[in-house]
Amino acid sequence: MSDPRYCAEIISVGTELLLGNILNSNAQFLAEELAQLGIPHYFQTVVGDNRDRLQSAVKIAAERSGLLIFTGGLGPTPDDLTTETLAACFETHLAERPEVITDIEAKFTRRGRVLTDNNRKQALLPVGAELLPNPSGTAPGMIRSPRSGLTLMTFPGVPAEMRRMWTETAVPWLHQNDWCRSILVSRLLRFWGISESALAEKVAPFFDLQNPTVAPYANNGEVKLRITAAAASEAEGVALIAPIEQELRAIAGRDCYGADNDSLASVVGALLHDRGQTLAVAESCTGGGLGQLITTIPGSSQWFWGGVIAYDNRVKQSLLNVSAETLAEAGAVSAVVAEQMAIGIQQRLGTTWGVSITGIAGPDGGTETKPVGLVYIGIAGPTGCFGVERRWGAERGRDWVRRLSAGEALDQLRRSLLNLT
């Protein structure tokens, strides 16, 4: 762990955060910013509008971090306690700042309002504090070092105001005061078709690296590995990451589909575009979800021709040429129907590839032999057609089944395109 004197801690003040009434987007923003600046931070605290509990949080944080960043509690109401609590914690008097009063009065005048006594509270800052101007609102922040090795920064809780103050004033101050001793450079590798535990087992030795570090994440069926290097420059960070990325890709093989802002749809689109090939889709249980993923990609009209949502068996028959006999014998949720759907859309639209999805998204409709979460994907291409069965389960709900099915369809197409290379 880094020297605590050079570590930051984010303290978010507001009962509305504790109650879950609003998301703590300020902490998310600041965490990302600190990472980009190369300032380590290991703790985040959320505390309600209570003087005693805020004092307790400050005392704990001041023992383990050298830069305490506060958001919220700078307003004019009695429950806005951040400034006065910090003054009490470090036995400092508050003094009214005339320049803040002037700024608030000017803003009130422009809005046709009159300065009230409670707004004067926002001009009270600890003696010796450096002002953090708030160009967008009436609550300024401050920077203060109450003792050696400890710096306090305060910001209003309004995200737009906080972000502007951070960017325009706080970040330059951090650079000028030698807080940004290195930068963090990251690379995000993306995987599909392998579980987080299986991938972690394959690459376990990499989790012990110190610089760069490797950390796994998983959501919505996708697994990610973030490689992060601390370096003096971006070029140095990229150089540290490159050999690790190469090794990880070699271990994962085709389970690694891309990096950073890549998506399965964008990767598939690039493969189709490079080959001059086209795609059409036929969807049942995903109800257009696959087409939506595809059409979010700019330029997808160059390789995606369209699709059919064949929710009813009559549509499967009339538009996709799925035979009534097959539907009667195998059922709509079957590999053979998925294959016929894929071939049907491929032939109807005249595309290189046809992809289909049919399944039981739930919560109803499952049976003992065909439970909720059972999905079949059909891939029809230049060399033939095949079907894939997936059992996602019912535990995570209908949307989960639909999302994973659309992602899996794209991944099966990606692998098919690569296999023809």
UniProtKB/Swiss-Prot annotation:
CDD domains: cinA
Gene3D superfamilies: 3.30.70.2860, CinA-like (3.90.950.20), MoaB/Mog-like domain (3.40.980.10)
SUPFAM superfamilies according to UniProt: CinA-like (SSF142433), Molybdenum cofactor biosynthesis proteins (SSF53218)
Superkingdom classification of source: Bacteria
InterPro entries reported in the protein's UniProt record: CinA, CinA-like_C, CinA_C, CinA_KH, Competence-induced_CinA, MoaB/Mog-like_dom_sf, MoaB/Mog_dom
Protein family (similarity comment): Belongs to the CinA family.
Name listed for the protein in its UniProt record: CinA-like protein
Native species: Synechococcus sp. (strain ATCC 27144 / PCC 6301 / SAUG 1402/1)
